[in-house]
Amino acid sequence: MRTPRRHCRRIAVLAAVSIAATVVAGCSSGSKPSGGPLPDAKPLVEEATAQTKALKSAHMVLTVNGKIPGLSLKTLSGDLTTNPTAATGNVKLTLGGSDIDADFVVFDGILYATLTPNQWSDFGPAADIYDPAQVLNPDTGLANVLANFADAKAEGRDTINGQNTIRISGKVSAQAVNQIAPPFNATQPVPATVWIQETGDHQLAQAQLDRGSGNSVQMTLSKWGEKVQVTKPPVS
C-alpha cells in the first residue's frame, strides 16, 4: 500500500516532469565557423519550420538556465517518436531541496517512471500527465514556435553538436511560448534565438526562449528522423 507521503511525493515529481517535458540543453559549442556574408534569416526559419512540422522522431535535450518559477527541472534528455507515439529518457530536477534523477518511458500510451531507483511504476495514460512526444506536435510544439517566430535576424555562425548553423534572433508570440512552455506565462512576445543548419535540410538544431535576467530554457534537437525504439519496462 502506498503511504500518503510517498504518493504525494510521486505526484509532485510527476508534475515537475510533465511541466519540464512540455518545454523540451543544448550540447552547443562556442566555436564560430568562418564564412562569408550571413544568409537571409527569414527563408531559413521558413525551411526549418517545414522540416520540423514533418519531423517524426528526434533526440531532445533541454536545460533550464537560472530559475523559472514553477519549473524545478535541471535537464531532460530523451528520444521521441510520433509513429507510433513513444518516448524514453531521463530527467534531473530539484524538489523540496533534494536532487532527483528519474528515467521515464512512454509506451503504448502509458507513462512509466523510476521515481525510486531501478523500480518502474505505471502512472497510467501519458495523455493524462504529459506525452513528451508532443514536443514534435506540429500545432503546439517546436514547429509552432518557428511558425510564430518574428523579426528574424541572422546574428552569426555557431557549431551545435557538430552541425554548422546560423544563429538567428527574434521573438516568439506569447501564445506559441505558453503552448510549449506554460511556466513562462507570457503576455507578450518572448525574445528567442534559434540555430538552424546553414546547409542541407536546414533542420532546427537548437532553440532558446529567454525569460529575462539570465533565465532561459534551451532546447536541442539531433538525430532527426532516426529510428527510435522504445520497449515497455518491467513494472515493480
From Swiss-Prot:
Single GO biological process annotation from the record: lipid transport
Superkingdom of the organism of origin: Bacteria
Stored Pfam families: LppX_LprAFG (PF07161)
Family matches, as InterPro entries: LolA/LolB/LppX, LppX/LprAFG
Membrane in keyword set: yes
One function term, GO molecular function aspect: glycolipid binding
Signal peptide segment: 1-26
Keyword tags: Antibiotic resistance, Cell inner membrane, Cell membrane, Cell wall, Glycoprotein, Lipid transport, Lipid-binding, Lipoprotein, Membrane, Palmitate, Secreted, Signal, Transport, Virulence
Region (Prevents bacterial uptake by a human macrophage-like cell line): 81-100, 141-160, 218-236
Protein name (database record): Lipoarabinomannan carrier protein LprG
Native source organism of the sequence: Mycobacterium tuberculosis (strain ATCC 25618 / H37Rv)
